[in-house]
């Protein structure tokens, strides 16, 4: 009776010690940082990759991906000459390690939909409105650089870093494309008439 009770008590105590010991360690994956929550409160300290000690059942570690992430966004805007422009923007960005805790606390894990996508929409509209539809085609690199700079200014304050910015496509309405084609045909006919 008594001996069996001591053995069972010893097994329960040993199991408890093992459970506490196993919950005292956490591992942060490569390319990630660990945000420490103590009773749900975000700590300013951010854990680097590797094995770390934590207070079992009191601290929780949230892994934030600090690798380069890709976002592709479709935007609709108007050019300076009021042409509707549909564009596709692709960018690579990452969360800076030191900003992981602040982003998790202020924005949460959905920073792409909360910060990145709206900022892209706003930057594309602001820059596109400065140029005519024709300039959007002929000055594409300059426009891309302006959009990238504006976007980087917007997202860097949150601890996000813009790596690569690309305008995948500028597309115009069928009516505008037909008008451009008609203009080119007229120019070619005029040039041909001059030569004849």
Regions found by a protein language model. Give the residues of each.
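Residues at secondary-structure transition points
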Residues: 107-111, 115, 138, 181-184, ...
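Signal for well-folded cores of large energy- and translation-related assemblies
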Residues: 16, 72, 108, 152-156, ...
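Amphipathic, coiled-coil-like alpha-helical scaffolding segments used for oligomerization/assembly
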Residues: 92-93, 112-177
């Amino acid at each position: 009776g008594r001996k069996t009770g001591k053995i069972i008590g010893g097994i329960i105590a040993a199991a408890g010690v093992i459970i506490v010991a196993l919950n005292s360690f956490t591992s942060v994956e490569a390319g990630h940082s660990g945000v420490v929550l103590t009773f749900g409160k975000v700590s300013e300290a951010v854990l680097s990759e590797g094995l770390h000690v934590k207070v079992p059942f009191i601290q929780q570690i949230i892994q934030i991906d600090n690798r380069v992430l890709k976002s592709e966004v479709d935007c609709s805007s108007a050019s300076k000459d009021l042409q509707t422009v549909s564009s596709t923007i692709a960018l690579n960005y990452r969360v800076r390690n030191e900003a992981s805790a602040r982003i998790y606390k202020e924005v949460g894990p959905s920073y792409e939909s909360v910060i990145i996508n709206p900022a892209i929409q706003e930057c594309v509209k602001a820059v596109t409105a400065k140029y005519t539809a024709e300039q959007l085609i002929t000055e594409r690199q300059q426009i891309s650089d302006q959009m990238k700079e504006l976007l980087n200014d917007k997202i860097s304050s949150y601890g996000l870093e813009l790596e690569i910015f690309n305008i995948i496509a500028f597309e115009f309405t069928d009516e505008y494309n037909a008008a451009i084609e008609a203009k080119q045909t007229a120019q070619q006919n005029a040039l041909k008439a001059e030569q004849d």
